């Protein structure tokens, strides 16, 4: 398995890294791609949560020069779509220090923005693909660890608005996230990711993590439904009690309480 790359451009280096503690999903295809080697962080470690990735990257950044460029790509959902020859040129054209991929808004625009917020405009930043200079990445990633919220995507968007050196890859020439609804869609981006690929574990995790953002909205709808459709009172009360029990006992509430 190839784990190291250091492509030199003048006085700086560009390094492509991922974080994975095991082989899963598209990992083998990623690390054995024909275009560029990948540096793997976190291999063999115990997975504790999404902040593991950020902590792992930050630790690695301490070994790099401030002017180096690090590209982070998700280890289980991403492929290197083509040669990386134009990577530096495309990044410099963005005129920013940190570039983050655009989220595909899997839950629809309104719901996705309700949960994640936005990054410097109307776009949602996706935490699975990003790149930047080491100096600015350190500032940004450290800030994403400050909130008590455990969701890296929420924190990425919250922190994004604090720094004017960050942009979202609106043109999607470097990064492209493709939703499960558009799997046959072609992309000319260098790095292509397929976040939220269908699996039972992902759906379960999403239900646990994201109920906190929509619980009040759903509860209000259920109350309205009870008033509007009294003949379904037994069913609606059961659903309300079940949802409330799940929220109280199992749902993550770190981002809303």
Regions found by a protein language model. Give the residues of each.
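Short beta-strand-to-loop acidic/aromatic patch adjacent to the donor-nucleotide binding site
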Residues: 68-76
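Catalytic core and acceptor-binding pocket of nucleotide-sugar-dependent glycosyltransferases
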Residues: 123-218
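Conserved donor-nucleotide/metal-binding helix-loop-beta segment in metal-dependent transferases, i.e.
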Residues: 79-117
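A generic structural motif
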Residues: 38-47, 100-104, 151-156, 168-175
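Short beta-alpha junction loops
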Residues: 22, 44-45, 77, 103-107
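N-terminal anchoring/stem segment of glycosyltransferases
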Residues: 4-69, 216-256
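Structural alpha-beta junctions
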Residues: 32-40, 93-98, 161-168
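A conserved hydrophobic position in a structured secondary element of the catalytic/binding core
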Residues: 75, 82, 132
